[in-house]
Amino acid sequence: MDDYKDTLNLPKTLFSMRGNLSKKEPNILKSWNENNLYKLIRKKNQEKKIFFLHDGPPYANGNIHIGHAVNKILKDIIIKSKNMSGFDAPYIPSWDCHGLPIEQKVEEKIKSNQGEISTTEFQEKCRKYAQDQVEKQKKDFIRLGVIGDWDNPHLTMNFKNEANIIKTLSKIVQKKHLYQDFKPIHWCLKCASSLSEAEIEYSKKKSDSIIVGFKFKYKSIIEKLFDFQISNKKEIHLLIWTTTPWTLPSSKAISIHPDFQYQLIETERCYLIIAKELVEKTLNTLKIKKSIIRNYVKGRFLEKMICLHPFLKNIDLPVILGKHVTLESGTGAVHTAPDHGLEDYIISQKYNIKTSNIVNFKGEYISNTHDKLDGVNVLEANSIIIELLIKNNTFFHHESLIHSYPHCWRHKSPVIYRATPQWFIDIDQKQLRIKLLQEIKKVRWIPEWGESRIGEMIKKRPDWCISRQRKWGVPMSIFIHKNTRKIHPNTFVFMKKIAKKVELEGLQVWWNIDSKEILGEEYQSYEKILDILDVWFESGNTHTTINYKNKNYTKKNADMFLEGSDQHRGWFMSSLIISTLISEKKPYSEVLTHGFVVDGKGQKMSKSIGNTISPNEIVDTLGADILRLWVASSNYSNDISISNEILKSSSDIYRRIRNTARFMLANISDFDPKKNIISKENMVLLDKWAIGQTKIVQEEIIQHYNNYNFHAVIQRLMYFCSIEMGSFYLDIIKDRQYTLKKHSQERRSSQTAIYYIINSLVRWIAPILSFTADEIWSYLPENNSQYVFMEEWFDKLFYLDQDDLFNYQFWNEIITIKHEINKFLEEAIQNKTINNSLETSIILYVSHELSNKLKILEQETKFIFLTSDIQIKLYDTAPKNAKKSKIVPYLKVSLEKIKGKKCPRCWHYFNFTKKNIKNSDICNRCILNTIGNGEKRIFI
C-alpha cells in the first residue's frame, strides 16, 4: 500500500497545544513594555469618544490579594473591550497612600528611636514606605496582564494631589458645610483615632447584657402620678437594659417613649416601671413569679422625673422623651450617655444636657470617675460595674449575648463610641442629603440593588467626621480662634495659599510653616489645627484630580466606578458627597460592584483558617490567563468561589478555546489573505453559514461585553468552540481541508472562513485571555496592527441571506439532526456494531420538505454526517426497527455497516471496480484530488 501522506494538506503550526502560560507570559509582557503598548493604543484611539473608568485607589500596603486581582482584572476586561468597541478608554491606576496602616508600619521600624524623629522626618519615612509598596503592587498588577499608564499613576501623596485635596476642603468651608463639634464618633482603641463609617465592619461579639434599676428620687411624685400609695419600705426602679455596662458611668439621663404606656408593678423586692408591652418578657427574664400591676401612665407624664445614678453618688438623672426608644427588646427605657451614642447625643442636645468625656484616647476612664474605675480600660470594666451595681442594690439581671457589633476594619477589634472634638461635614446643610438621594437616581447601578443599598445608607448616615488625630495625611490646613473656637473668616483664601505651598513641597509644609506667614499680626489669636483628613475624604476627591478629559469628552463625571460591594458606604459614598457638594453633580454615570472571594465551600478567605489563595501563586503555576478566565467565568455580582477544583475547571475551558484556535491556525498555515481570499459569491455554502453564524455570535458577545456579563461571554465562547465549531463546522471541513487540491477554490473557501473566524475569535478573547490572544495574533497572517488590542471587532463578517433556501433555520435543523445521529452512532460503536461513522451507511427517514432540501445537496450530504454513504428516504417508509428521534419530529434513522473498501487516503469506504485506475487502491474522489482536476463542492 502506498503512503499518501504527502498528497494530503495536513495541518501545520508552531502554535503549541500546551499554553505554558507561566513561562510565555513574562516574554509577552516584555514586548508590551518595550513597545509601550498602552501609548500605542491611546495614540491610535486619540480621536475617538472617551470612556473613562476611574480606578478606585487600593491601599498602598502589603502584597496584593485575590480580591485585588478580581478587581483589577474586571477593570482591565472592561477597558480592553471598550477600546475594541471604538472608544478611547484610558486607564490610570490609582493608589491611596496616606493613613494609619502606613504609620503603624513605619512606627514598627523606628521603635527604638521613635521619640527622636520629628514629625516631618516621620512623614518622609511614611512617603518612602508608601512608594515602595506602590512599586511592589504595581509589578504584581502588571503581571496580571493589566494594561494602563503605569508610569504615571495617580497617587494621593503626589504633591499636586495633596494640594488639590486642600483646595476641595476650602470649597466646602466656603459653602459653610464644615463645623466642629464635641460629639460621639466611632473610636478605635488600637488606632487611637476616630473612624469613619467606611472604616467600620460588623462582626459577632459576646457582650454582657444587664438590666439595671434607676431609683426615683422623689417617691411622692411617682405616687401621685400613678395614683397609688407607695410602700415606704420599697424603692421604685425605672428599669433599663444595656449591652454596654461600661457606659453607665457616663449616664446623664434615662430616655423613654412619650407615647408608650408604662406600668407600675409591685414585686416582693421593689416597685418596677416597665413599658406595658415588655412587662411579661422582662418579668420572665428576672424570674419574678409574684407581681401586681398597680397602674400605668403614658411616657410623656414621666418627663423630667428625677432618678438617681445606679452607683455614682450625688448624681441626679432626668427622665427625657425620645422616639428612638423601641419595643423590640429591653424594657422600654434606655440609659442615655451622650458621650457614647449618637442617638443619646442627639436627644441630650434637645434637653441641653452637656457632653463630657470620661474616657481617654486609650479607652481608659480618666481620674475621678470612680475609685474602682480610674485608669481601667472600658472593655475590661463590665465586671467591676456589675459589682458596683450589686453593692448599690440596683442590679437585676445579667446574661451573655452574642450579637453584631462594630469593629475596626484594620484591627478587627471592637470599637467604642467616644465623644471628642472633631470636624464634620454637615450632610443636611442646604439640603445636601436630599440632593445626594436625587443624584443616585441618575446613575446606572449594576446590580440594580446597589441604588437602594446606598440610598438607605444616605438616609441613615450621620454627618461625616473627616478629622483624624494622626500625622501621615493631608492636613486640614485651618486656623481657629483661641477663644471663640471659630474658623478664621479668611480661611478660603488662606487655604488656597497653603495649597500652593503644598503643591511645591508636600503636606509637610503645614507642620513647618510659621502661622505668622499666613495670618500676619493675627497669628497670636489663632491656633493651627494639626488634625489630618480622613483617607476616605482623600480618595473621595480623586475624581476631581485625574486628567482623563480631551476634546471629545463632554461629561462632567467619570463613566464608571467599579469596586467591591463594601464600597457603597466607602468610596462610592465619599465621592458622591464631595462631588455633589462641590459641583452639585454625581461623580459617575455607572457603578458596578463585585462580591468578595470565598473558598470552594463558600467560606470567607482568612489567614487564620488557612484557606487563602495568592494570585501570585496562581500566576506562577497556571498563568495569569487562567486567573483572568476564572474571574470572567464567575458571576461576580455575588461572592466569587475559588479552589483548586474551580481553577482546574477554568484550565479545561482554556484548553478548549486554545485547541480551537490551534486547529484554525494549523489549517491556514499556507493561506495568504492577499492572494487566497474567496469572495462571498464563490464560497461553499457551509462556509457562508460559518461566517454568518460567527457574525451572530459576535453580536451576542459584544452585547455581553457592553452589559458587563463576562460569564455569558465565556459561556457563548464555549458553545461556539465546542458545538458550533468543534463538533460541527470544523469537524466537517477536515475532509475538504485535507483531501482536496491545495489551491482549489473549495479549500480556499474554507480557509477564508477559518481566517475570518479566527480573526473574530482572537478579538473576542483579547479582553479576557490577553496573553493567549497576543500569542494567537502573532501567528495570524497579514495583521493590520502590531497588537490585537489596537484593533476593533472584526468587520468583514457577513450574514447569510435569510431568503436563501439554506438559511439559518435550515442549518439549525441540520445541526440538531447531526447531534441525534451522533447519539445513534455512539450507541452502535458501544455495541461494537461499527467502529466509526465512516464505515457506516446512514439512512435518514425525513419529511417531504427536508427530503427535498437534502436531495439538492446530493452526494455532499454525507460529508455533514461524516459517513461514506447516506440515503434520504421519506419518513413514512421507515421500517419498524428504524430508530426514532425523541427530539426531532419526523426523523428516523437506520445504520448499516457499509460494504466496500477503505480508501487509505481519505478513509472513506468505496466500491472498488475495474473503473478504478490500474494499480490504484484509492477512491475515485482521491484520484481526482491527486492526479485529476480536483473534486467539486458547492454545498459542503
Curated annotation (Swiss-Prot):
Q: Name one Pfam family in it.
A: tRNA-synt_1
| Known EC number | 6.1.1.5
Lipoprotein keyword on record: no
Which residues does L-isoleucyl-5'-AMP bind? E563
Q: Which HAMAP family match?
A: Ile_tRNA_synth_type1
On assembly, the entry states: Monomer.
Question: What's the protein here called?
Answer: Isoleucine--tRNA ligase
Please tell me the species this chain comes from.
Buchnera aphidicola subsp. Acyrthosiphon pisum (strain APS) (Acyrthosiphon pisum symbiotic bacterium)
